């Protein structure tokens, strides 16, 4: 902890030729908000900026100012190579920590080394470094502390029983050594108590082991369920930007593989780690009572082994992290291929997908084998060291027995106890690799739990239903996707959707039409300008209310869930009655084909609705959008992927659904938007021209050119795109 709080310019060691560099006091951001700039977690310097929550004291600022004045006039030596963290970092933290804390308790919140700073404000979620979050871990562990405490007590009891067993075995050996065959009766009498005592200890040990393993399973499984639930909830609450940047396979991997890995490590730490540590400590006490000289041999060898393990740990931890990330990438490739298997089959790309997945698996194998070699090296060295310890014990212990300084029974007890120590430390060495993987997995899980979305799911005001008109205004909106910040999709975009009217957006692909719909749904916030509903900024409204009750969205490729038709329609309004579902289906022209199925509304549609035709899926999507009675309806290429007959049926449903609602239609087929109250032609992220169908044809602008092109391209012959006018035409639309 001190390393994080007091890195004040001393890492990297002293300068050549200087005894100690001057301390560089800087402001310290209490919250380590990191953002992506090439590498996640890299901090940058912002001169003169202070944390909003914590400001340095006037004394600290004066010292910093004086230091900067003196530093400017001092001769400077070249900087030594910087290591992070270095030995000087540890020394400085240890020496300065108590002193600074005693002088000013808030200095730990306002000191930052020269190379670090607070980042500027960003609209993208902050991704923290992949470090194990002990605070989050405590939140999951806290509800189970009582059960865990009982399990720990039972594990400690089992360990203490194991400590007593070597002593009793030594006493039994003493009895065996004292008597010969002529003293059978006395031997049986004296050994009976020891044997009975040993049997009782073995039974108690078995019961204690059973108890703590059952309780650990109870705690571990419940923690895993809580973690998966919290992680899934956190993922669902992330911005759409987050899902643009992360593959589904990697997210699923964290929900399954990483949580399982962490749970296994947690259970092993208690069941084997705590027990082994207790046995090592208890046996060392027993060993010191039996023979101080032999115990010193173990005490000298043990720190050396721990030092080697610590040095190897950092490298193995990094390898484990890389291995898990590679597994997630492989799962992402598999998920993508299997999720789009129809497209893969249509293009006969099975071989290519196999090669892609095979390449990722090969990378997984290489990293896993490298990690395995590292763990094997560690365990091999540990076994060699432990066996050498046993050999040394036999050699020195035998000489002590020969010199009458140690009895045979004590040597037997020492050997059994040392074997217990050896076995426990071997378990710890095996546990080391598992703990490394578990900490890495836990860090990956907690990393996503700690993310805070820029657009919350709820919070803000709601407009009463009777006061909601449905007027939508885009005022001087500029927007760039966070994954492509240098490319503006919308540029000074201004548009008004009058209440109860149909406004159609047309234009070439890439003009920003779908982006307009995404901003209206508030999947993203504009980088400049404002989007308003009835004169209220969308950012002041409750997003959950906006999406759940006000805006209905029907896309070109509707996504259905692998459940019944009834549940798919009810997805738009969970509390809807069966009669409301039937009404929405009739309004969407879906009731007839649904009732033609043997199971009717209880028909399971299959994954993504694969058992239904395109027109049937689209009508179910319309019913799902209409069941919540939205005030604003978005139709994004809702009929472009359908055949003529399906398009006719779906268009009838859309016309019926549009009555009395504010409708935003995005279309490529211009024939479907001729009846719109206003047709807006978009080009280069701007409104190029607007008006009714007849008005735009009379203007002879871009819309008229698009109409002519579509008439010529009816046979689907290739043709170059139409030329853009030299500039947008002035227009006024009367609602």
From Swiss-Prot:
Give a single Pfam family match: ABC_membrane
Expression induction or repression? SP1 transcription factor binds to the ABCB8 core promoter region, possibly regulating its transcription.
Q: Which residues bind ATP?
A: 507-514
Domain ABC transmembrane type-1 residues, every copy:
150-437
Q: Which residues form the ABC transporter domain?
A: 472-709
Q: Which SMART domains match?
A: AAA (SM00382)
Any ranges marked Mitochondrial matrix in the topology annotation, and which?
26-144, 217-295
Q: Which GO terms describe its biological process?
A: cell volume homeostasis; mitochondrial potassium ion transmembrane transport; potassium ion transmembrane transport; transmembrane transport
Q: What is its main location?
A: mitochondrion
User: What GO CC annotations are associated with the protein?
Assistant: ATP-binding cassette (ABC) transporter complex; membrane; mitochondrial ATP-gated potassium channel complex; mitochondrial inner membrane; mitochondrial membrane; mitochondrion; nucleolus; nucleoplasm
Q: What's the stated role of this polypeptide?
A: ATP-binding subunit of the mitochondrial ATP-gated potassium channel (mitoK(ATP)). Together with pore-forming subunit CCDC51/MITOK of the mitoK(ATP) channel, mediates ATP-dependent potassium currents across the mitochondrial inner membrane. An increase in ATP intracellular levels closes the channel, inhibiting K(+) transport, whereas a decrease in ATP levels enhances K(+) uptake in the mitochondrial matrix. Plays a role in mitochondrial iron transport.
**Assembly state and interactors?**
The mitochondrial potassium channel (mitoK(ATP)) is composed of 4 subunits of CCDC51/MITOK and 4 subunits of ABCB8/MITOSUR. Interacts with C10orf88/PAAT. Interacts with NRP1; NRP1 regulates ABCB8/MITOSUR protein levels in mitochondria.
Q: What's the protein name? A: Mitochondrial potassium channel ATP-binding subunit
